[in-house]
């Protein structure tokens, strides 16, 4: 199935393509797989959808997990309404960048990565993160 357990070796980076969907458990499992790789680790994380009233709690749990990890930079994609809430929570961390759409994400991650780095791309289907894979170096 496209977007699940797919590894793409590109000219500069290796991409873990997990773009098909996201749940709190699968995000943590994929981050752990990423961290087993050598060199620098980056995450492109589209917000998880359909979590109901627990959504903010689940996202905060993932953010704490990322903050405690070796991930150099996390590009987080969320709706504008959620950005205000999450930005306030994450402003003390320099690991996170916020976007409301996928337009400039590949360009941004390409500025941070160097040869041999690893990038995990994970998020809910509605973000269509697979569209940016071919734009990452």
What positions do the PLM features span?
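ATP-dependent carboxylate-amine ligase
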Residues: 1-137
């Amino acid at each position: 199935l496209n977007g699940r357990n797919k590894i793409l070796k590109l000219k500069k980076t290796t991409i873990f393509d997990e773009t098909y969907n996201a749940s709190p458990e699968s995000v943590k499992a994929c981050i752990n797989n990423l961290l087993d790789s050598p060199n620098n680790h980056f995450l492109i994380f589209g917000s998880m959808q359909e979590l109901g009233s627990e959504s903010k709690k689940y996202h905060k749990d993932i953010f704490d997990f990322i903050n405690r990890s070796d991930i150099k930079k996390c590009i987080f994609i969320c709706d504008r309404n959620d950005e205000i809430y999450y930005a306030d929570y994450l402003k003390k961390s320099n690991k996170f960048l916020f976007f409301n759409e996928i337009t400039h994400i590949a360009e941004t991650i390409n500025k941070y990565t160097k040869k041999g780095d690893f990038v995990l791309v994970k998020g809910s289907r509605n973000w269509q993160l697979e569209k940016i894979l071919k734009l990452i170096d």
